[in-house]
Amino acid sequence: MDGKRRPGPGPGVPPKRARGGLWDDDDAPRPSQFEEDLALMEEMEAEHRLQEQEEEELQSVLEGVADGQVPPSAIDPRWLRPTPPALDPQTEPLIFQQLEIDHYVGPAQPVPGGPPPSRGSVPVLRAFGVTDEGFSVCCHIHGFAPYFYTPAPPGFGPEHMGDLQRELNLAISRDSRGGRELTGPAVLAVELCSRESMFGYHGHGPSPFLRITVALPRLVAPARRLLEQGIRVAGLGTPSFAPYEANVDFEIRFMVDTDIVGCNWLELPAGKYALRLKEKATQCQLEADVLWSDVVSHPPEGPWQRIAPLRVLSFDIECAGRKGIFPEPERDPVIQICSLGLRWGEPEPFLRLALTLRPCAPILGAKVQSYEKEEDLLQAWSTFIRIMDPDVITGYNIQNFDLPYLISRAQTLKVQTFPFLGRVAGLCSNIRDSSFQSKQTGRRDTKVVSMVGRVQMDMLQVLLREYKLRSYTLNAVSFHFLGEQKEDVQHSIITDLQNGNDQTRRRLAVYCLKDAYLPLRLLERLMVLVNAVEMARVTGVPLSYLLSRGQQVKVVSQLLRQAMHEGLLMPVVKSEGGEDYTGATVIEPLKGYYDVPIATLDFSSLYPSIMMAHNLCYTTLLRPGTAQKLGLTEDQFIRTPTGDEFVKTSVRKGLLPQILENLLSARKRAKAELAKETDPLRRQVLDGRQLALKVSANSVYGFTGAQVGKLPCLEISQSVTGFGRQMIEKTKQLVESKYTVENGYSTSAKVVYGDTDSVMCRFGVSSVAEAMALGREAADWVSGHFPSPIRLEFEKVYFPYLLISKKRYAGLLFSSRPDAHDRMDCKGLEAVRRDNCPLVANLVTASLRRLLIDRDPEGAVAHAQDVISDLLCNRIDISQLVITKELTRAASDYAGKQAHVELAERMRKRDPGSAPSLGDRVPYVIISAAKGVAAYMKSEDPLFVLEHSLPIDTQYYLEQQLAKPLLRIFEPILGEGRAEAVLLRGDHTRCKTVLTGKVGGLLAFAKRRNCCIGCRTVLSHQGAVCEFCQPRESELYQKEVSHLNALEERFSRLWTQCQRCQGSLHEDVICTSRDCPIFYMRKKVRKDLEDQEQLLRRFGPPGPEAW
């Protein structure tokens, strides 16, 4: 019998879906693709070094580094920011792009042109940013105080203002929550002004309002509460005051009043600011104090659209955990921290640093620094952060793991100077728990690490919020967006690598560097930073709000800005979940398979267009009976399909229509500039801007419909959807009435489906070109029947088209060229859904390709039958059977038992550290169990299934996963009854392989008996064959040896595939990436090899005649 072969490449090896997947003739060890990239980065960086500046910059930074923290030899001059020249505040302005605006309460500072500083504490706004030259800036903005409004009660005059201020001050000082630690008056001023509420059209114009200015932002809430309860005013009793704009954040209030938007450029004019040269409060290179009214805000247009050379740092850590236990900061050490730094606008990282515990072999293209003590390692990284001074910090899951782990570990080891990771001197970074919940994402429990002055952009959180994927592991998203795989090492194996030698620690460092490099690649590829900067500019909110807050603050900011120009105020509404409203219209689909072109007509920006066309806004809403009371004529207001009334633009133009007009016209300008622009960086900015403008316009409608929100208005949201339903129905009627045989067309048109903002029309023509021409003609003709700016546009043609049901269809999409389809488009089908196993998506996609592209229904049916046969005979790889579902809430909060929830609970009992947590996607497969056992009890971890050889419930996958999707596709073609008979019954379903597991059930009590390999007869001895098959023993032996050889060859191919991916052909494969099908295949073949070798041993040792 042959011995086990050495793993090596074989002929016909399929390339792995990774970089470096080609086979070489020799298997000599060579660097991985990532290591070659690192070396190339080093060469590119060497070309840009400025040798004459290095010594000067190095000396300046060493003066600020505490003795013993980082040796001078360990600091690379390239880490440092350029040294700013001397700046004269009297003659030179300070111009910088602000990235973050927050506030603190502290002692007042003297500023040029400002009043003498008061003795008590005052709120100071703080803007962090970067200049064009790359210098870091912190600007302290003084003199701005928080305020809010309230309507003046009847009879209130100037003589009552002093009395109200005294009474409110007294009430706040007595208040248990508001009056603590007050050193001066809480209310600074009460002023009379003329304003108008934005909610509803009243017809009487502005009315008296009180503007109440308080000393500190935290005093707004108690002042509002006490005013709502009632404050005594001499001669007026104890009236109650309704608050307006009392729920606006202090930073938003300041930015609205000064016309500052997120991430725009600010200018401190010469002579108007003071530089702090000594006693600086931050670690920024330039620190200034200025009066709030002297700050100049540049709109992000033209040259002010540029983005400063921001410093982006991506990092990853590795910990040495104990076997079977996820690392815990109280017990398990941090063994490596790898960092990559990028200057925005440059092609490659300028900084590649690996900090390791214990010696590590050199890595070409990266700087390696080793430490014997973990405390020194942690302190070195903390000092490195302060030296490198990043503006943006990114990574993968740094928010919930890396940063909290580092801070907790430093506390455990009592590294007192570690947690100063922000830009404010002496301010520790701390950890707090946070929870976010929405209808779209469910509940997510996260941690928040404060790092004042630096923007945290965790790529995992970005992807969870912006993209719907089957898996969110770094490996899965890297393949999905970058087409790259990475080695994925289990936390228990990391400890073995650390305890090895300097070469194994080098392998771990390369792995850690790549884990830091990939988030940086994702940040660039998905334009995350550029898009976030442009969204902050468009909506006017600080960058951090986009990453940590919901959608509503973006619309509130725009609403406040527009309202301020018109003297309107936003009321504080106590929102409670109210009544729901009818959504968009869906025209009943005419189901079937269409072998003729189907033209799709789409309303451009439907909901924003409706709001602009019909002037739907808070400011134009008429309460029931108001139109008659104000004497409005029929041509001065409209009645919507839902019965609500709004005044027309001739009476008052609404705020929301004005905001939408500005957004959409700005988008049109951005797209026009984008078409002409050639500079790649500027193209990125413009593309991000037009996308931000589009998203912002579409979110305005959602803001009005949010039942629990800042300013919900059911009348607006239900009127918008009411008009939408009416327009879809009218479009159907217009198309079907014009394009008829009676009007001279070859056939009469029919609308086969309509959904929200689009209709699908069958014009009866046979060619795509004719359908396109008629679609464009129909879109122009129908648009003329609707008020501007509502416009119906021709979008695409489907040919052929498979219409299955509401929101479920597929077809070949033609949008520009009639002679070549763009792609196969699927909506609502399992080909694009992520709540089924990959087998479903792959089979549905393959079937659709055969039906729509190849036009081969028989081939599609045959392929589906083959896959079903393979499934029932256990020939499908387990990676194709993995189902993933998100854990959105605790087990007790689910109404019924869920498979992924129950599995998460079982995994938590096995290993609490590595069990899924809220917000994670849980992978599982369904295993066989006794008849009648519920599906949620049969869910199991795929790796656990492989390790314990548990049998898969193939019948479940056929009936619960494959059956319905396949019938939906094939019934329109084969007919309802025939589709089921052909696909789910027949010869291909009669042959089944039933496997038995090694553990559980009756097998725990059963005694195993050997069977004859030839005829399966139960044997009474330990041999391989029975007496009847003895003459065929040699033949049977050769057959099993051949099977073993085939398994060894398959294992060899898979093993070498994985070696290629990890970048070494002479090291063991330790990757355990559950998102890679090769991993499951390799585990399965290894198990099959062990079983086959055990079977061959039953034949006994070869006799002398074999030699």
Swiss-Prot record:
Instruction: Return the motif ranges for CysB motif.
Output: 1058-1076
InterPro entries, per the entry: DNA-dir_DNA_pol_B, DNA-dir_DNA_pol_B_CS, DNA-dir_DNA_pol_B_exonuc, DNA-dir_DNA_pol_B_multi_dom, DNA/RNA_pol_sf, DNA_pol_B_thumb, DNA_pol_palm_dom_sf, DNA_pol_type-B
Glycyl lysine isopeptide (Lys-Gly) (interchain with G-Cter in SUMO2) crosslink site(s): K574
The enzyme's E.C. designation: 2.7.7.7, 3.1.11.-
- The UniProt annotation places Zn(2+) binding at C1012, C1015, C1026, C1029
Q: Which residues carry this modification: Omega-N-methylarginine?
A: R19
Q: Where in the cell is it found?
A: Nucleus
Record note on what altering R1074W does: In IMD120; uncertain significance; decreased polymerase activity, when tested in transfected HEK293 cells; does not affect protein stability when tested in a heterologous system; does not affect interaction with POLD2 and POLD3
Question: What chemistry does it catalyse, as a reaction equation?
Answer: DNA(n) + a 2'-deoxyribonucleoside 5'-triphosphate = DNA(n+1) + diphosphate
Q: Where are the zinc fingers (CysA-type)?
A: 1012-1029
Q: Where is this region: Disordered?
A: 1-34
UniProt-reported outcome of changing A145D = Found in a colorectal sample; somatic mutation
Nuclear localization signal (motif): residue ranges:
4-19
Q: Which PANTHER family match?
A: DNA POLYMERASE CATALYTIC SUBUNIT, DNA POLYMERASE DELTA CATALYTIC SUBUNIT
Regarding domains, what does the record say? Answer: The CysB motif binds 1 4Fe-4S cluster and is required for the formation of polymerase complexes.
How it assembles, according to the record, is: Component of the tetrameric DNA polymerase delta complex (Pol-delta4), which consists of POLD1/p125, POLD2/p50, POLD3/p66/p68 and POLD4/p12, with POLD1 bearing both DNA polymerase and 3' to 5' proofreading exonuclease activities. Within Pol-delta4, directly interacts with POLD2 and POLD4. Following genotoxic stress by DNA-damaging agents, such as ultraviolet light and methyl methanesulfonate, or by replication stress induced by treatment with hydroxyurea or aphidicolin, Pol-delta4 is converted into a trimeric form of the complex (Pol-delta3) by POLD4 degradation.
User: What's the protein here called?
Assistant: DNA polymerase delta catalytic subunit
**Source species, please?**
Homo sapiens (Human)
